[in-house]
């Protein structure tokens, strides 16, 4: 009797493959990320807080009335009709400097008002330090100026000149009744 031997060749199982996939992204200080979004949220809250505090204390109204009617510009403005080297020399300017000045945050302040025909709006710069970045935040507050509102001198004191009595104030009288104009003060802030 013959015996037959059968040999079976088993193949070894294939080794598992491991693939590594890498994705690289450069992150700069101004890249959108969770931390930069957090910084923007803080700047937004700070801008809103400055405006709210200034409105509550009356400093915001005093700041929009801090107008040199003979020079047709804000008092002590460094260039043109507005400030370029720092905030206005008043309580609102002090608040802006406290909140933004020491943190490396640049800001512009604009005052938007109704134009003479009552339908269009115009914008007066109060503080302008440059073009905002793409990550700039904006906050605004409206100040309703009455016909009885009085311009402020360079020390912040009342001049005795009502806005309704001068033609040299940047915003014209467009409302009927006791309201002179509604001024929207906007702070635009960004990290430098």
PLM ranges: what are they?
Residues 1-22:
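N-terminal single-pass transmembrane signal-anchor helix
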Residues 22-192:
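N-terminal export/assembly leader peptides and their processing motifs that target proteins to secretory
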């Amino acid at each position: 009797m013959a015996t037959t031997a059968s040999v079976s060749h088993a193949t070894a199982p294939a080794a598992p493959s491991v693939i590594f996939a890498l994705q690289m992204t450069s992150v700069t200080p101004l890249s959108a990320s969770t931390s930069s979004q957090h910084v923007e949220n803080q700047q937004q809250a700070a801008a809103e807080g400055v405006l709210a505090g200034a409105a509550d204390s009356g400093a915001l109204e005093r700041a929009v009335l801090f107008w040199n009617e003979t020079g047709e510009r804000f008092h002590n403005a460094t260039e043109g009709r507005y400030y370029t080297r720092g905030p206005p020399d008043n309580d609102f300017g002090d608040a802006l400097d406290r909140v933004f000045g020491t943190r490396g945050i640049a800001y512009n302040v604009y005052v938007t008002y109704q134009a003479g025909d009552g339908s269009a709006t115009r914008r007066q710069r109060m503080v302008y330090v440059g073009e905002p970045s793409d990550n700039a935040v904006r906050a605004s507050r409206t100040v309703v100026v009455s016909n009885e509102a009085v311009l402020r001198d360079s020390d912040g004191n009342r001049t005795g000149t009502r806005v309704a009595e001068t033609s040299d104030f940047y915003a014209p009288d467009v409302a009927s009744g006791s309201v002179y104009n509604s001024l929207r003060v906007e702070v635009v802030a960004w990290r430098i």
